[in-house]
């Protein structure tokens, strides 16, 4: 009986051992983390300046907050404004007189500077003229010759030789040089502006005979 019980208990243990599920295997260790490669991005100049300004502002604010709290000054250490007594104050009339004197001095200095500058300018012009050779300075006779050499033109209406038959005549404005004889004649003062008809030749002979008689 005892052996049979032992056998039965042995079979039960065997079945119990066989029925127990296998223990799960431990998970594999995680792979080692790889460091991310640094990536560089192009930033425009304007955005870069804005970022720098923002960093500067934040650092300035951080410095201000990090400063230790300062104790207020005592009343004895504070500097009070200087109080001017009425006796020391300058009257208004004296101030006006002093301002007027300063303006007069400024005007006087300005006039002196203007006169001095004018004198220096005239002196420089004289020196520049004296430096030039006498051949470059035109004499009065040469000036008259240059004036005479200048030509004057006048506008004259001309008609071409070939004219169209069905339309009106063609007019052309031409610039012609003025002759000096015409200028001399124009300078002569005429006593009368009347125009007389020309005497025919046969009458001239008769008039001459009458005068001879």
From Swiss-Prot:
Region (Disordered): 1-70
Record's compositionally biased regions (Basic and acidic residues): 1-19, 43-53, 60-69
InterPro entries (alphabetical): ZNRD1-AS1 (IPR040005)
Record's protein name: RNA polymerase I subunit H
Tissue specificity field: Expressed during spermatogenesis, initially at pachytene stage with abundance increasing in round spermatids and decreasing again during spermatid elongation.
Biased composition (Pro residues): 21-31
Stated role: May be involved in male sterility.
């Amino acid at each position: 009986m005892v052996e049979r019980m032992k056998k039965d208990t042995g079979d039960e243990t065997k079945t119990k051992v066989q029925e127990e599920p296998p223990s799960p295997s431990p998970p594999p260790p995680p792979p080692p983390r790889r460091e991310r490669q640094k990536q560089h991005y192009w930033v425009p100049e304007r955005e870069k300046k804005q970022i720098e300004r923002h960093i500067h502002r934040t650092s300035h604010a951080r410095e201000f907050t990090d400063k230790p709290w300062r104790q207020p000054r005592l009343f004895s250490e504070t500097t009070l404004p200087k109080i001017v007594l009425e006796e020391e104050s300058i009257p208004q009339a004296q101030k006006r007189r002093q301002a007027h004197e300063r303006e007069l001095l400024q005007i006087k200095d300005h006039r002196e500077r203007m006169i001095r500058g004018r004198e220096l300018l005239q002196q420089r012009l004289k020196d520049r003229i004296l430096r030039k050779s006498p051949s470059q300075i035109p004499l009065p006779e040469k000036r008259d010759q240059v004036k005479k050499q200048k030509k004057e033109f006048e506008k004259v209406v001309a008609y071409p030789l070939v004219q169209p038959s069905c339309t009106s005549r063609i007019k052309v404005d031409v610039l012609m040089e003025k002759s000096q004889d015409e200028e001399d004649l124009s300078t002569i003062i005429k006593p009368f502006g009347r125009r007389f008809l020309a005497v025919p030749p046969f009458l001239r002979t008769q008039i001459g005979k009458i005068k001879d008689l």
